A protein has these predicted regions:
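Glycine/proline-rich active-site loop of Rossmann-fold NAD(P)-dependent oxidoreductases
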Residues: 98, 123-139, 149, 154, ...
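Active-site loop of short-chain dehydrogenase/reductase
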Residues: 59-63, 112-114, 150, 156, ...
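Protein kinase-like catalytic domain
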Residues: 56, 108, 146, 177-178
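Residue(s) in the substrate-gating loop at a strand-loop-helix junction
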Residues: 68
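NAD(P)H-binding glycine-rich loop region in Rossmannoid oxidoreductase-like domains
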Residues: 5-43
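Catalytic helix-loop patch of NAD(P)-dependent Rossmann-fold dehydrogenases
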Residues: 35-50, 57, 62, 71-117, ...
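Hydrophobic alpha-helix immediately C-terminal to the catalytic Tyr-X-X-X-Lys motif of short-chain
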Residues: 99, 103, 107, 137, ...
Length: 204
């Protein structure tokens, strides 16, 4: 176990010299990132640079990392969904992730480190982290309902999101490693189906 903000992570990666590196470490709470931009940058950008430097030193075949669909915050969705070339983040969190994607492209061009970027939509499933300042929707709803309370909604129940099961996400993680055609590509990970908060509440 090592903190990616510590440059020692470069030594660890170089020592074990894996063929592939999955990089999912970082700050994921929009609210925490907005409250402390320094920590957000330290974790999501500077920490990621340490990981990528380690990958370069170890001649890793490819780094597969988590970006976010939040980079589409200010983009207009077409009938076919969001295009992976789009990016217009508005929060500190999504901006750090957009920077990470640009860094990965730069490392590929200048240092030969191949990558696969994964833009997750709303991932749900077992072991979801509910300890954040504001829990993810699924976990937050379940906690409230189990406690005998109505779920808390910021805004209205008409808000719709694309929810994807963590098992499907993990299956794609493996596919990325096994299929070299995913190298130096960016993928949206979602179902393409929107569910509003009222339907989600009734489902739970």
């Amino acid at each position: 176990k090592v903190d990616i903000r510590n440059q020692y992570v470069e030594t660890v990666i170089e020592k074990f010299a894996p063929d592939y590196v999955y990089h999912f470490a970082g700050w994921v709470s929009i609210y925490d990132c907005n409250a402390d931009p320094y920590e957000a940058v330290d974790n999501n950008i500077l920490g990621s640079i340490n990981v990528m430097n380690g990958c370069v030193k170890a001649n890793v075949k490819r780094i597969i990392f988590s970006e976010t669909s939040a980079v589409y915050e200010n983009c207009k969705m077409s009938d076919d969904g969001y295009n992976e070339t789009q990016s217009d983040p508005t929060t500190i969190y999504s901006t750090t992730k957009a920077c990470l994607a640009l860094l990965a492209e730069s490392y590929q061009r200048t240092k030969g480190l191949n990558y696969t970027a994964l833009r997750y939509f709303n991932v749900a499933g077992p072991l979801q982290d509910y300890h954040r300042t504001v829990p993810p929707v699924f976990a937050g709803f379940i906690l409230r309902i189990m406690g005998g309370h109505n779920p808390i909604v910021f805004g209205d129940y008409k808000k719709s999101r694309d929810y994807i099961n963590v098992a499907d996400v993990n299956a794609f993680h493996i596919l990325c490693m096994e299929n070299e055609e995913t190298a130096n590509q960016t993928f949206n990970l979602g179902t393409g189906k929107m569910t509003n908060l009222l339907d989600l509440k009734n489902l739970i």
